[in-house]
Regions:
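C-terminal substrate-binding/active-site "lid" region of AdoMet-derived donor-dependent transferases
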Residues: 245-301, 307, 442-466
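S-adenosyl-L-methionine
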Residues: 2-162, 167-176, 186-224, 228, 365-405, 444-454, ...
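Conserved S-adenosyl-L-methionine
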Residues: 176-183, 434-436
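A short glycine-rich, Lys/Arg-flanked "PGG" loop and its adjoining helix->strand segment in the class I
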Residues: 241-258, 426-436
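A short acidic, Gly/Pro-enriched loop at the edge of an enzyme's catalytic core
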Residues: 215-229, 236-237, 376, 392, ...
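Short hydrophobic/aromatic beta-strand or adjacent loop that forms the aromatic wall/cage
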Residues: 304-310, 477-481
C-alpha cells in the first residue's frame, strides 16, 4: 500500500516541479523563487520572466510542470489556493524568505521616488524602439537603479559620464541623481537624441548629445571625454566588442577610468555569456565586478528580460589592442533584421559591384564624372577592384570626408549605397561629401524620403550646399534615389559650415566672418570669435563638428547663423 501511495504522489504536478528544480541544482533556488511568485497571486508570463530573470522557456517549463495545480484567469496564472500550502512546505518558502539577500539599493530607491516618477513619465513618452537596432526598453526602475549604483560606487562630482548609446534614457536618471556630473550621449537614433535634449533642458541637466553610428565613427566630441562610460550594447559578440571598444575610445582617464556594461544572455546558453565576456579579453580589460540580473527590460524574454552589469577597467594592453579591434569590426552586429549577423551578405560582394546601375547613371547626367563610390563596411572588401571610380567606406567619409587625392578633377560625382541606412546616414553623406553631385540610394521608408514633409525638411537643411531631387521607386519599388547637385558657391556662414562639416563649428563660423565682405572694417580673430559666442545659443557645440550634431541642433544652428555674411 505504501508503494502504491508513493506512485500516486509522484504522478502529481508537485513531483514534476521537484524533478525540474532538482535538475537545475545548484541553481534550483531561482526556480523556487519563481514558485514564490506564482504563490503570491495571479501574474502574467511577461512579469514572471522579468521578476524571476529566468528565460521564458524555463518559466514555461515550470508552468507546464505545475500544470493542473495552476489557477488561470485572463492571461495570468497562480498556484491554486488549495495547493499553495503544499508548495510552501515542499519547497521551503520560509527558508527562501529568511535567507534572501537584502537589496543594497533599497534605502536609496525609497528616497528616489520622485526621480522614478519622472523616469516613468519620460520613458512612457519616448520614441518607439527600433527592433532592427536591438532596442529593448529598460524599466524606469532600472534606469534609476543604474544611476543610484553609479552614484554610490564612484565619485561623479565634476566627472564626465559618457553613454555609448542610450535608448534606455539612463543619462536622464544619472543627471537627476548626480547633478554635479556632466553627461555626454552618443547614439545613432536622432529621435532619441532630440528627446533626451528636450528633457535635459526641461530638467536643467548638463547633457550633451551627438550622433554616432559606432560601426563607422564615434563623434569627435565624445572621444576622449569621459571618466566613466556606460553602455548597453547589442547582445552579440560583435556588438559587445564594438560598443566596448567605442567606450574605451571615449575614456579620457586611461589609468582610472571605468567601462560599465549591461549584457544579457540566457542561462540556457552559457556559451553566449562566454562570447560576450570574450570582448573584454580581446580589449585587454580587467573584470572588477559582475552584478547578476541587475537590469530589467520590457521584453527580451529569451534572456529573462534581464542583463548583468559588468565593470571593466582598462589596462596598458587595452590601448595597444584598441585600434586593431575597431578597424577589424563588421557592420552586421545586431540580432535581428538586415543588419543582423544572419543578414550579412554572402560572398563578400563589394558596394561597387552591387551598386544599382540607375544610381550610377544619374551621377553622369549633365556632364558630371563619377569619381567616388561609397558603401558601408558590410558590403565586404574592395579586393580585386582596380578600374573605375575610387572607392571609400562610409566610415572614412563620415570621419574625415573625401580624401583630397580623389577630388583632383571636376566636376565630379559621388555615388553612395545607403540601402542599409538606419536613418542617420543620408544627411551625413550630404554633409560630408563636397562633391558637385551626389547620388544616394536609400530605402523608400527612410524618414528623409518617405513623404513630402521629410523631403522638404532634408532639402531645407542642406539648401545652402545642394539642391535635391527625389527619384521615388528607383531603382526599384523598395528604394529611392536622392540626387544632390551643388549650388553656386556662396559666402554665407551656413555655406561655410555645410562645406566644412568635419571642422570645429566655432572655428569654421569664425573663419566665415573673417572672410565675409560686409563693407564694414575687417574683424580681428578675437572680435570674430566674440561675435560667434554671442550668437550661438549653445556654447558647447562650438567645439563640436557639424557632422556630429543631431539634426534638430543642426537646424537651430543654421538659423542662428543665417543672417551673417553674404550670400
Amino acid at each position: 500500500m505504501r508503494c502504491e501511495t508513493y506512485a500516486v504522489e509522484e504522478a502529481e504536478p508537485i513531483a514534476a516541479v521537484a524533478a525540474l528544480i532538482d535538475a537545475h541544482r545548484p541553481d534550483g533556488r531561482r526556480l523556487r523563487e519563481l514558485l514564490c511568485l506564482l504563490a503570491d497571486g495571479p501574474t502574467d508570463l511577461a512579469e514572471l520572466v522579468r521578476r524571476s530573470a529566468l528565460p521564458r522557456k524555463t518559466v514555461e517549463e515550470m508552468l507546464a510542470a505545475v500544470g493542473s495545480d495552476l489557477a488561470r484567469e485572463g492571461g495570468k496564472a497562480a498556484i491554486a489556493a488549495g495547493k499553495a500550502d503544499a508548495y510552501r512546505k515542499r519547497f521551503g518558502f520560509e527558508q527562501l524568505s529568511a535567507t534572501r539577500l537584502a537589496d543594497p539599493l533599497q534605502r536609496r530607491l525609497a528616497d528616489a521616488v520622485a526621480v522614478q516618477r519622472v523616469m516613468e513619465h519620460v520613458i512612457a513618452g519616448a520614441p518607439a524602439a527600433l527592433t532592427e537596432l536591438d532596442h529593448v526598453q529598460a524599466t524606469p526602475e532600472t534606469a534609476v537603479r543604474r544611476a543610484l549604483w553609479l552614484d554610490s560606487t564612484y565619485d561623479l562630482r565634476g566627472a564626465v559620464v559618457l553613454c555609448v548609446g542610450d535608448h534606455d534614457l539612463t543619462s536622464l536618471a544619472v543627471g537627476q541623481v548626480t547633478p554635479g556630473a556632466r553627461i555626454v550621449v552618443a547614439d545613432i537614433d536622432e529621435r532619441i537624441l532630440q528627446y533626451i535634449d528636450g528633457w535635459a533642458a526641461r530638467l536643467r541637466l548638463d547633457i550633451r548629445c551627438y550622433v554616432s553610428d559606432f560601426r563607422f565613427w564615434l563623434a569627435e566630441a565624445a572621444a576622449g571625454c569621459a571618466d566613466l562610460v556606460f553602455t548597453d550594447p547589442p547582445y552579440t559578440p560583435e556588438g559587445m566588442t564594438l560598443f566596448t571598444a567605442r567606450a574605451l575610445q571615449g575614456l579620457a582617464n586611461k589609468d582610472h577610468g571605468r567601462v560599465v556594461v549591461a549584457y544579457g544572455y540566457s542561462d540556457r546558453h552559457p556559451s553566449l555569456g562566454l562570447q560576450g565576456q570574450a570582448a573584454a579579453s580581446r580589449l585587454g580589460l580587467a573584470a572588477e565586478e559582475q552584478l547578476r540580473a541587475f537590469s530589467r527590460y520590457e521584453g527580451a524574454q529569451a534572456v529573462g528580460s534581464a542583463s548583468d552589469l559588468y565593470v571593466w577597467r582598462p589596462t596598458s594592453r587595452s590601448w595597444q589592442l584598441l585600434d586593431g579591434v575597431v578597424s577589424g569590426m563588421q557592420a552586421n552586429i545586431y540580432t535581428r533584421g538586415g543588419q543582423s549577423l544572419e543578414g550579412a551578405p554572402q560572398g563578400g560582394h563589394s558596394g561597387w559591384s552591387a551598386m544599382p546601375p540607375p544610381v550610377l547613371r544619374v551621377t553622369a547626367d549633365d556632364g558630371f564624372q563619377l569619381r567616388v563610390v561609397a558603401a558601408s563596411a558590410w558590403t565586404g572588401a574592395w579586393a580585386g577592384q582596380t578600374a573605375g571610380p575610387a572607392r571609400i567606406r562610409l566610415g572614412t567619409l563620415f570621419s574625415t570626408g573625401i580624401p583630397a587625392g580623389m577630388m583632383t578633377r571636376t566636376p565630379f560625382a559621388l555615388a553612395a549605397d545607403l540601402r542599409a541606412d538606419p536613418g542617420a546616414w543620408l544627411l551625413r553623406v550630404l554633409l560630408a561629401a563636397n562633391a558637385d553631385r551626389v547620388a544616394a540610394v536609400v530605402p523608400s521608408g527612410h524618414r528623409d524620403v518617405r513623404d513630402e514633409a521629410g523631403q522638404r525638411a532634408l532639402a531645407a537643411l542642406v539648401e545652402s550646399k545642394f539642391t535635391l531631387r527625389f527619384l521615388n521607386g528607383q531603382p526599384d519599388a523598395g528604394n529611392t534615389i536622392v540626387v544632390a547637385t551643388a549650388v553656386s558657391s556662396g559666402t554665407s556662414v551656413a555655406t561655410w559650415l555645410l562645406r566644412q562639416a568635419h571642422g570645429k563649428i566655432g572655428n569654421v563660423w569664425r573663419d566665415a566672418l573673417l572672410a565675409a565682405d560686409t563693407g564694414e572694417p575687417a574683424l580681428t580673430k578675437r572680435e570674430a570669435r566674440a561675435s560667434v559666442e554671442a550668437r550661438a545659443s549653445r556654447q558647447e557645440i562650438l567645439s563640436a563638428r557639424l557632422i556630429d550634431l543631431p539634426r534638430h541642433q543642426l537646424a537651430l544652428l543654421l538659423e542662428e547663423c543665417d543672417d551673417v555674411g553674404g550670400t
